[in-house]
C-alpha cells in the first residue's frame, strides 16, 4: 500500500472524525499523482459499494438514535469549523457561505438533530455564550501522518 504525502496540519479535535485511511494530502499536480489519487478514490468507492450492498436495515432504535446523533455531531462540527468557510465568505458573502455550508456541504445540521455546536463541544464556549472561532482549543495539531501504514495511532506526544 502506498501512502500519499500528508496534507499538512490537522487539529486533534478534527482528527477524531477521521479514519486512519483518510486521504489528507497535498502534492504536485502531475499525471502520476492524479492517477494515484484517482485510483485511491476508486478503491474507496468500490469498498463503499460493497458495504452498501451488504448493509441491512438497523431496527434497534437505540443504535439508530446513536448513529443519527454521531452523524449530527460530525455535521455540526464541520459546519462550524470548516476550514474553507473564510474563503467562501470572501467569494460569496457570509450569508450565502453559511447557507452553502449548512444546506449543501453539511446538510443535516438542522434536520438530523437539535443540539447546537456548544451542546456537543462546550469547551468552545466563550464567556458571552458565543463560539470561540479558534480552530483548536486543545492546541495540538498533526503536521505529519498520525497513523502508521497499518492504522496504528502514533501521533501521541509529538503533536505540535
Where are these regions (language model features)?
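Alpha-helical oligomerization segments
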Residues: 61-160
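Mixed-charge (acidic/basic) macromolecular-recognition segments
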Residues: 1-83
Amino acid at each position: 500500500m502506498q501512502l500519499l504525502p500528508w496534507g499538512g496540519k490537522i487539529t486533534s479535535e478534527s482528527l477524531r472524525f477521521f479514519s486512519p485511511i483518510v486521504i489528507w494530502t497535498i502534492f504536485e499536480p502531475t499525471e502520476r499523482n492524479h492517477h494515484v489519487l484517482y485510483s485511491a478514490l476508486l478503491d474507496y468507492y468500490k469498498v463503499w459499494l460493497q458495504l452498501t450492498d451488504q448493509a441491512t436495515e438497523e431496527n434497534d432504535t437505540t443504535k439508530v438514535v446513536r448513529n443519527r446523533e454521531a452523524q449530527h455531531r460530525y455535521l455540526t462540527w464541520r459546519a462550524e469549523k470548516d476550514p474553507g468557510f473564510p474563503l467562501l465568505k470572501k467569494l460569496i458573502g457570509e450569508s450565502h457561505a453559511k447557507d452553502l455550508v449548512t444546506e449543501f456541504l453539511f446538510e443535516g445540521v438542522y434536520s438530523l438533530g437539535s443540539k447546537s455546536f456548544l451542546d456537543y463541544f462546550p469547551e468552545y464556549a466563550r464567556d458571552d455564550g458565543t463560539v470561540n472561532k479558534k480552530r483548536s482549543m486543545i492546541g495540538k495539531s498533526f503536521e505529519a501522518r498520525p497513523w502508521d501504514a497499518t492504522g496504528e495511532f502514533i501521533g501521541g506526544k509529538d503533536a505540535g
